[in-house]
Amino acid sequence: MRCFRQLLFILAVMVCGHLMAQNSQRDLERLMQNHGEYFFTLTVDQPSEIQTISDLCSVASTDGKTMVCFANPNQYRILVDFGYRPQLQMPPSMLEEPVMWDGSHRETYDWDAYPTYNAYENMMQSFAAEHPERCTYFELGTLDSGRKLMFCRINNGHPEGKPRFLYTSTMHGNETTGYMLMLRLIDELCTSNDPRIVNLVNNLDIFICPNTNPDGTYYTSNQSVYGARRENANEIDLNRHYPDFDKGPHPDNNWCYQDETQWLMNLAQDYKFTMAANFHTGSEVLNYPWDTHPSLHADDEWWKLVCHEYADQCHEWDTNYMNMPHQCADHGIINGYQWYTISGSRQDYMNYYAQCREVTIECSNTYIPNATTMPMYWNYNHNSMLSYMEQCLNGIHGTITDAETGGPIVATVSIERHDHHGSEVSSHLPAGDYHRPIKEGTYEVTYSAYGYESQTFTISVNDNEAVKQDVQLTPIPNTPPLADFDAEKELVTVGSTVRFNDLSQGLRLVSWAWQFEGGTPATSTEHNPVVVYETPGTFDVALTVTDASGQTHTLTKSNYIDVYHSISIHNGEVTLADCRGLFLPSGGDCGHYGNNENYKMTIRPENTNRRIIVNFLNFKTQPNADVLSVYDGTSTNAPLIGSFSGMELPDSITATNTEGALTFTFISSEYINFFGWVATLTCTGGESVDENGMEVAIVYPNPCKSSLNIETKGLVNYGLYNSLGQCVLSGVFVDETLVETTGLPAGVYILRIIGESGCKVEKLVIEK
């Protein structure tokens, strides 16, 4: 009997424990619903599941079996619908009330409390105000919340010709250890006269942004980091949001870049950093390239050298620190792809697109550590941070100049049989300096520039040493300048600004003359101008460059900028003015549609002899639940052309009814929403070009892999547009041409062919 009672007691305890666990999970789910972000663990049986889950949500860390993850409400619901059973955990930012500092009595502040947002802003500005001989303060921009992306730039007042170095942190708002490390590092660089610090200030041009996601860090209040979350204010994981050389310009399938992302990309292109590091938390390891691809970086051995140096110096303080347990980890360092693959990381963008050696430093297992432990993390990382910066001074350095004038030039520095995937570097104006970190060895280094004779040198370099190799390139006489440029975006809505980037080459260019049809200003002599487009249309852009001898070259990109009226779905009717519209979901071009939507909208042409055409550039809704339907007429009583859901891009649709109208309905479910769609609205008939009216235009093969044939009659312009509306290939030909597509990522593109007989728009699929 006694044994029976004991058994009943044990069973009761087990049942109660199970019920309490269920209640705890329900309580956590309610908490996270209100917070807008879910934090959980998942156990996987097969390593292949890690990639599947990584595609569905944000994996923060994994030991190969247990995954620590974050998800926005959409991602979490999809994960559950896929059959996964996440174990919710208390959000790290809500485990305790953090100690905050309001900025008062700074003379006694010991870096053991998190600053309020206002204290952070005041501190950043005061660094420059109090130490103008070393520090300048600037802002990349102000977010909709009023919070800013703030930088301190530190040097000895003479930055020309020196390597540029970048430290950033906290692109995930709830990862605050690096935030505190960066603030304290700025303070030391501004105030210390230690010879090691003075050497860095004198020989580097240092940029530091302690917090690149302030909306995430101060999500609940400017007064506290309590409730900080990983994503930004728009529920975007900023470390999945960058262009990816393997997965395309927007691997997270969001149509437009967040301000935080675009501003950092602009900064990288403007300043051409030599080295960088981006601080995260959630693990303790240095994660080096690549994140997105199994191939090794060209400088893989160099990456192991500098990462081991960082981790080894941390181990001098504590052998258990910076030593993540993982089968692929090597004493505190790990290749990103071998850990777990992600697409759209900042690290991969900087290395591939910006010629900058950037590493990801995971500097604490705890997301928001107790602020009193910050001095400990400073001790662990201090020497390592300085050593990593000092590596920017090693390798091959020099200036590249014109052999006749001695003036600095922009040239490419490439290493034979070594460089690939963007590992080559370039020299920079105004000094013509270049900086090439590299592992010890003997290399064949080639220096080349348009209009100059290339030179190749055999250069030997040792680890942790610098070799100087100045180069003079001999100009090729009478080489004409070559104008070239690109735009930050080519498909925009009325009122948008577009930044243009000069890519011209030539001997001693002295002037740039831009013409912007339909833009304000209409002309510019700036190197990289910014233009506003206030009226709809398709506009040319022309650039004329002139060299010192007076030779000129003009490049005109016809129909380069497409400007449309913005038309978001709603209940009612719209008359398509100018036959140019960008059809968007209720969230606009950068937001998501909402839950429980039920819209019906009819779009009519301005003139009755025209018909509406819709071409989808991007499409993503919740499969089988959120549905966009299109009817050939002015109501839902008209014939149904099609209903679309999921990720497959709909074909081009043209109205055939006498009024030329299309009616759209959109219904969304009670949960899970995506960005929806982006589609151009144009017209047939009248003065507008018939988008399917070209007499002869044969495009094959479709799908294609490495090349595409276009056959037509006469002189023809063509443009190939990616899912963002960016022109990735363009050209002019007569009768026929072969277009090489080898360098383009797999995906769906829009091919526009314009000739004397009309225009043809066709969906093109590129496969790999």
Give each language-model segment a name.
Residues 469-565:
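Extracellular/lumenal mature domains of secreted and surface-exposed proteins
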Residues 407, 415-439:
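Short, acidic Ser/Thr/Gly-rich low-complexity loop/linker segments typical of extracellular
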Residues 3, 511-513, 691-768:
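C-terminal outer-membrane/trafficking sorting elements
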Residues 404, 474-488, 564-574, 681-700:
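Residue-level detector of functionally pivotal "anchor" positions at catalytic/ligand-binding pockets or at interdomain
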Residues 159-308, 312, 316, 320-323, ...:
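Active-site/substrate-binding loop(s) of hydrolase catalytic cores
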Residues 88-94, 496, 553-556, 564-687:
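Domain-level representation of secreted and single-pass membrane ectodomains enriched
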Residues 440-451:
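A short, solvent-exposed beta-strand micro-motif common in secreted/extracellular proteins
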Residues 396-403, 471:
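A short, amphipathic beta-strand motif
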